[in-house]
Amino acid sequence: MSACYLIALYVSFESSYDTFHSKAGRIFRMVTDIKTPSETLKVDVSTWSTAPALKKDFPEVEGFTRINAANLNIRKGSILFKDEKTFFADSSLFHVFDFKLVKGNPVTALKEQLSIVLTEKAARKYFGESDPIGQILILSRDNLPVTVTGVMKDIPANSHIKGDMFISMSTFTQKLNNNLDADWSDFGAVSYLLLKEGTSPKALEAKFAPFLESHAGKMFREAKVQYILSLEPLLEIYLRSTRGDQEKGNATNNYIFSAIAVFIILIACINFINLSTARSAERAKEVGIRKSFGAGRNLLTAQFICESILVSLIAFFFSVILSSIDPGI
């Protein structure tokens, strides 16, 4: 039973990725097939301009947010922190996703240039117990000072987006390209769409080809590139997506482990029945005595069922204890 309990915990956790977002069923990542004369690239990014243009052209799109991952060196005073997991993100991040701020305004925290939101873990790392709001950190690569404008709860372990800090997208565009929202050639944005209630993602996808043709068809034809855009449900990214370099699970493994758990339970049930049958001969005398005192079939049946349930509960109790033991002890 301990093995089944551990398998159930594992499968449950693997299947729970990104389910903590209240709008998870309406969030989709935009993914791209980039076809050239020599190869086809299947990527988890789109051009920077795609999401804003979709929001403008289609009323079915309630909102969007884009992120771009980077490992940055962060300096606080004279102390350098290397390869910090950082994201540049649109200010709409906290509207699309349920990343909760404990300090700061979720609407404005990532709106201005040179602003940064830290997780509680990162805030303690850089500032201890001091209030981080208004404090300055330096992006050492470009020597850019960023101001802490918010502190968010640590990202849950069952999130495919994992990082400790989010820097305003306007900080990124300031250094790279102020006209990035109109750039149809730079595939650097991991973009998420929030669709309105009742919107069919398949129906929206059917409109993508003429949408891309109207905005950048000529440019892609001249470059001999075909750009195919599609939507990937947020709840399928971790277990089923083959795109991107984020942490991935495996839905097939979940099915295999679940089948193993069912097989173990079946074997345990068969063993329990065999043991009970073997003991029935030993208990025949007990049954006879109880009958002589007036015990009927229903009472005897209830007794045996209660005994079986009690044994199962005791086994489950010990399985939970065994499963909780730290193997490092």
Tell where the protein language model's regions lie, with residue ranges.
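N-terminal membrane-entry
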Residues: Q246-I264
